[in-house]
């Protein structure tokens, strides 16, 4: 899994039936210091993540399976909304803090 920040939504009214009901988000991956990387991805979201939230993103075959719904044509799936990230030097992220 990777840390990412939600930058926005992607709307696609015409898509494969396997993606019906799956919200699509534009996410930017984060490094170990919480800084944005130059990598972006469109990820499916079934957990209800919102703009600017930090999320956990599963990629590859793990992204294609969720709750026994079979394979979905996804390379990335938001599988969790992050509340806090703590490292040896202290708090890296706290959802309650402003400015993130």
Swiss-Prot record:
Keyword match NADP: no
GO biological process: carbon fixation; photosynthesis
Gene3D superfamilies: EutN/Ccml (2.40.50.220)
Coiled coil: none
GO MF assignments: structural constituent of carboxysome shell
Location of the protein in the cell: Carboxysome
Keywords, in A-Z order: Bacterial microcompartment, Carbon dioxide fixation, Carboxysome, Photosynthesis
Chief location category: other
GO cellular component: carboxysome
Membrane-spanning parts: none
Domain BMV stretches: 1-83
PANTHER family found in the cross-reference section: BACTERIAL MICROCOMPARTMENT SHELL VERTEX PROTEIN EUTN, ETHANOLAMINE UTILIZATION PROTEIN EUTN
Recorded family membership: Belongs to the CcmL/EutN family. CcmL subfamily.
Function: Probably forms vertices in the carboxysome, a polyhedral inclusion where RuBisCO (ribulose bisphosphate carboxylase, rbcL-rbcS) is sequestered. Has been modeled to induce curvature upon insertion into an otherwise flat hexagonal molecular layer of CcmK subunits.
Domains as described in the record: The tight homopentamer forms a pore with an opening of about 5 Angstroms in diameter which opens into a wider tunnel at the base of the truncated pyramid. The pore is positively charged.
SUBUNIT field: Homopentamer. Interacts with full-length CcmM.
Protein name per Swiss-Prot or TrEMBL: Carboxysome shell vertex protein CcmL
Organism the protein comes from: Synechocystis sp. (strain ATCC 27184 / PCC 6803 / Kazusa)
